[in-house]
């Protein structure tokens, strides 16, 4: 397929939007196990929204059309809690060029909770909080409050934890081999686990070594790296 990037981006955005629309009308019963399954599915799709924005930052969501690539990235960053695409891009490139140093905006030499707090404060702004609050109060006029919390707000929070844990904390924590200039480790080669945890982003050494690869090609890169080693 020539335009895989557009296909994957469109698929993730469409599935997220359709499932959210359905779930905002879903009758919630907290004894219903499907409520929790749907919440996790929505979390995974929301994470996919950010991963698509991330690929756009690297210019690989739609590599043959810079304008469309940037538009998709801007759109995905915006619906991911009103993130500023230009700010994300600037900080993410700083992360790649200064990985695990004081200049790395994603790095913190501390425990999980303090690192996550620093990570969140690095990117979240007061304007995002205000816009999310306005959006919530407007949507509350149309949809049940508990549906908004369970299928929109909680997945938004969980997806940041998912991205942080599998895409920052696990790959970059602790000591790294001196020979590893990327200072990024990868999870074990298990494509199913890697996909459901964070769209292969757990193959983080491969991402830093080949930042021009979109998320769906990291599995192949992992296999090649393992074969070489």
What are these regions (language model features)?
Residues 19-34:
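Short, hydrophobic transmembrane alpha-helix segments
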Residues 1-11:
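N-terminal membrane topogenic signal
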Residues 4, 30-34, 63-71, 144-146, ...:
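Membrane-helix interface segments
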Residues 49-50, 85, 163, 167:
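Alpha-helical transmembrane segments of polytopic integral membrane proteins
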Residues 51-62, 95-96:
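Active-site recognition of the HExxH zinc-binding catalytic motif
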Residues 63-113, 173-229:
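Membrane-proximal soluble regions of multi-pass membrane proteins
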Residues 38-53, 73-82:
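A generic, lipid-embedded transmembrane alpha helix
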Residues 36-43, 101-195:
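Hydrophobic transmembrane alpha-helical segments that form the core helix bundle
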């Amino acid at each position: 397929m020539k335009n895989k990037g557009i296909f994957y981006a469109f698929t993730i955005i469409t599935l997220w939007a359709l499932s959210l629309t359905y779930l905002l009308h879903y009758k919630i019963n907290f004894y219903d196990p499907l409520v929790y399954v749907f919440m996790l599915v929505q979390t995974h799709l929301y994470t996919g929204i950010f991963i698509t924005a991330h690929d756009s930052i690297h210019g690989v969501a739609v590599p043959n059309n810079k304008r469309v690539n940037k538009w998709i990235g801007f759109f995905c960053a915006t619906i991911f809690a009103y993130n500023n695409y230009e700010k994300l891009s600037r900080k993410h490139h700083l992360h790649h060029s200064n990985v695990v140093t004081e200049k790395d905006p994603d790095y913190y030499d501390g425990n999980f909770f303090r690192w996550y707090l620093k990570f969140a404060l690095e990117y979240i702004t007061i304007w995002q909080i205000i816009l999310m609050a306005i959006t919530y109060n407007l949507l509350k006029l149309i949809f049940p409050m508990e549906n908004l919390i369970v299928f929109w707000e909680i997945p938004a929070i969980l997806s940041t934890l998912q991205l942080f844990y599998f895409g920052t904390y696990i790959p970059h924590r602790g000591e790294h081999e001196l020979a590893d200039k990327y200072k990024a480790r990868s999870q074990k080669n298990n494509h199913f686990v890697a996909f459901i945890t964070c769209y292969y982003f757990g193959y983080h050494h491969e991402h830093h070594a080949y930042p021009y690869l979109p998320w769906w090609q990291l599995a192949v890169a992992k296999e090649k790296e393992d074969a070489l080693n």
